Amino acid sequence: MENNVIVFFLSFLSSVVFIEGFKRFQKKLRIGQYIREEGPDLHNYKTGTPTAAGLVFIPIFIAVLLNFNRGPESFLIAFSALSYGLIGAIDDFMKIKRKNASGITAVQKLFMQFTAAFIIVYFIQQINPHTYLIVPFSGYKLDLGWFYYLLSSVVIVGVSNAVNLTDGVDGLAGFVFIGSIVPLLIVGYQSVVYLSLIGLLMGFLWHNWHPASIFMGDAGSLALGGILATSFALNGLELFLIFFGFIFLLETLSVIIQVTSFKFRGKRVFRMSPIHHHFELLGWKEEKIAFRFSTLALLVSLLGIIGWREL
């Protein structure tokens, strides 16, 4: 218990202090976020806001995790954080270098993400060999054979990108992530991992609540998704991400629905996707979106805890 308290407060305080320094560093160099043209016009004023806070809180996460838990699972989660954080950092760097919102290409990003995912899945099989998915509420182990390796890799890449899609409104990705994982503390699953992340994200939100003075960037969002997916894949719990990553799944589905509908019907289902922009264009304030989405994330993840009881 004492270690858990230390993990949380160490993560929180480190995040608050070092992100503040990182903000000042970027302002001194006059670098910051470039807003994508296809996003809402409401966001244009955010151009130049410091970004890539993930470059601060992900290294802190790795240091805290490996200081308090040096088991093989922790090393693999740290590798996931590092690899996806680096992919995001490259993307953030290219945006700053090119002075626009275009980072690396989708093909380049997916290639790096799947390479990292294949490595992660390989080492998962060394740590905890399995080819099954545990079905929520039943505990049934659905054996997929060799197909599991591919599916698990797709899940890791998909969740990483889903968190990235959610990071489009001040405070949204951070609060939704916290709401999604807090219930895991009830069952004590990967306590050091999630206590550290909660502390770090609360520290980040100290600076990211509307109006945000810094964004997490791809370095943060891709890494958070990689951590979440890897921690579940370690034990065949990918299906539980339906509950513990519900909002991230919803955001991704909204993009798929929007693109598919426009391609085949010539009509848009939402005013803009991902879906948080739809509500933004309906007049919802950013604080309202962040609060309601994170509340929904918390409620759905609590349902996941009920299904967890069968494990």
Swiss-Prot record:
It catalyses: UDP-N-acetyl-alpha-D-muramoyl-L-alanyl-gamma-D-glutamyl-meso-2,6-diaminopimeloyl-D-alanyl-D-alanine + di-trans,octa-cis-undecaprenyl phosphate = di-trans,octa-cis-undecaprenyl diphospho-N-acetyl-alpha-D-muramoyl-L-alanyl-D-glutamyl-meso-2,6-diaminopimeloyl-D-alanyl-D-alanine + UMP. One of its GO terms (molecular function) is metal ion binding. InterPro entries: Glycosyl_transferase_4, PNAcMuramoyl-5peptid_Trfase, PNAcMuramoyl-5peptid_Trfase_CS. Its EC number is 2.7.8.13. One of its GO terms (biological process) is peptidoglycan biosynthetic process. Its cofactor is Mg(2+). The lineage of its organism: Bacteria, Thermotogati, Thermotogota, Thermotogae, Kosmotogales. Keywords: Cell cycle, Cell division, Cell inner membrane, Cell membrane, Cell shape, Cell wall biogenesis/degradation, Magnesium, Membrane, Metal-binding, Peptidoglycan synthesis, Transferase, Transmembrane, Transmembrane helix. GO terms for cellular component: plasma membrane. It is a multi-pass membrane protein. It is found in: Cell inner membrane. Pathway: Cell wall biogenesis; peptidoglycan biosynthesis. The chain crosses the membrane at residues 2-22, 48-68, 74-94, 104-124, 144-164, 168-188, 192-212, 214-234, 237-257, 288-308. Catalyzes the initial step of the lipid cycle reactions in the biosynthesis of the cell wall peptidoglycan: transfers peptidoglycan precursor phospho-MurNAc-pentapeptide from UDP-MurNAc-pentapeptide onto the lipid carrier undecaprenyl phosphate, yielding undecaprenyl-pyrophosphoryl-MurNAc-pentapeptide, known as lipid I. It comes from Kosmotoga olearia (strain ATCC BAA-1733 / DSM 21960 / TBF 19.5.1). Belongs to the glycosyltransferase 4 family. MraY subfamily. The keyword Heme does not apply. It is an enzyme of class 2 (transferase). PROSITE patterns: MRAY_1, MRAY_2. This is Phospho-N-acetylmuramoyl-pentapeptide-transferase.
